[in-house]
Each structure stands twice: as C-alpha cells, then as structure tokens.
Regions:
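Hydrophobic/aromatic beta-strand patches that form the interior of the parallel beta-sheet core
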Residues: 9-11, 37-39, 65, 115, ...
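Conserved inter-motif catalytic segment of the P-loop NTP-binding fold
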Residues: 34-98
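P-loop NTPase motor core
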Residues: 77-141
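Phosphate-binding/switch region of NTP-binding enzymes
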Residues: 112-180
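The Walker A/P-loop phosphate-binding site
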Residues: 1-55
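Well-ordered alpha-helical segments embedded in enzymatic catalytic cores
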Residues: 21-25, 72, 102
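Conserved catalytic network of the ASCE P-loop NTPase/AAA+ motor domain
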Residues: 2-3, 28-31, 56-57, 75-78, ...
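Short, flexible loop segments at the rims of nucleotide/cofactor-binding pockets, characterized by
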Residues: 14-16, 64-65, 124
C-alpha cells in the first residue's frame, strides 16, 4: 500500500478510512518488530478492531501520546521506527505555523519514518478532487503526498501518490490491494 520507507502525508476524506489505513500500517510495523509512536487521538474501538489480534509482546512496542505533550527531542521520537501523527493539523482552514513547526521538529528528531494524516480540503476550483493542507511545504520537508479517496462503488478506495495509484477494497474491517 503506502511505501514502507518514505515519510508520507496521508490526505483522506471524511469517515474512518484514513484511521483504518494508518492502523494497518501500524499493525504491519508492530508485527515486523518495529517501535511505533502514535501522536494524537487513537479511539479504543478503532484500535481494537485492527490491533486486537496482535499479541501483547508486539503491542508493547506501541506508545500513544498527545500533540501537546510531545517534545521534539524526546527519546521516544529518536527510538521510534514509525511515527503516526493523527491528525498532524486541524481539520479546517490552513495549517498553522505552530503545526508546521511541530511536524518539522518531529521529522528532524526521528530516525524512522513519519505518517502525517490530515483531512483533505475540497478543490475550490470545482474539479471535484481533494487538496492537501500545506502540500508544497510538507513536500519540501520530505513528505510524499498520498490521497485516499472513495470510488463510486461502496467498498473500493483509491490510494494515489504523484507516481502511483493503488486500488483498495475494504472488507471485514481491513483494506486489501486489488490492483496497483
């Protein structure tokens, strides 16, 4: 699905598709023995539905913290193989300078990769697509932008980067790749 080696900005629509995809990335990382740090909201029901089958030894590698409590030079960030920021910015308007600065600090402090998720904006030009908050700034910081959107059919989703498109199908609370 999402490249396992690059930091990404995941732009998603309303609903829980973005959360589900991030949790699947977390599950894959935990099962491979990685240390994961989730910054932001992590509802227990969503986490249980995806991570409920992961054994305690692997789950012990998952830490959850808040945006307000994280310090960019923390040991947790330095030892994390994967950092999920859910969400990295507010869900309306432009991302604030403090949010961009916090993301930059986290990118500079972690040796692992970062997935910064945010709700997309509707394209004001009437094109019908989604736009990403502060896209050019985040790409300058090294994040690749991926858009997760629904297809017309109920179970299908499209995960799209500048050079790849992956068709996903949502079944039994998880995404599986249909075509790349």
């Amino acid at each position: 699905m999402i490249d396992d080696h690059r930091s990404v900005h995941l732009v998603h629509g309303p609903g829980n598709d973005g959360m589900l995809l991030c949790l699947q990335v977390v599950k894959r990382a935990l099962l491979s023995g990685s240390n994961v740090f989730w910054i932001g909201d992590l509802p227990a029901a969503s986490a249980k539905s995806v991570l409920g089958s992961v054994n305690e030894e692997f789950l012990s590698r998952l830490l959850v913290g808040s945006n307000e409590a994280i310090e960019s030079d923390s040991m947790i960030l330095r030892t994390a193989d994967l950092v999920i920021m859910w969400p990295w910015c507010t869900n309306h308007g432009r991302a604030g300078k403090s949010e961009i600065s916090r993301l930059r600090g986290i990118l500079d402090s972690t040796n692992g990769r970062v997935v910064a998720a945010s709700l997309g904006n509707q394209d004001a030009s009437g094109g019908g697509g989604m736009t990403a908050r502060s896209r050019s700034m985040l790409e300058e910081m090294g994040l690749e932008t991926w858009f997760l959107s629904r297809q017309d059919t109920g179970f299908r989703r499209v995960l799209k980067s500048p050079d790849r498109e992956v068709e996903l199908e949502r079944r039994d609370g998880e995404f599986s790749v249909v075509s790349t």
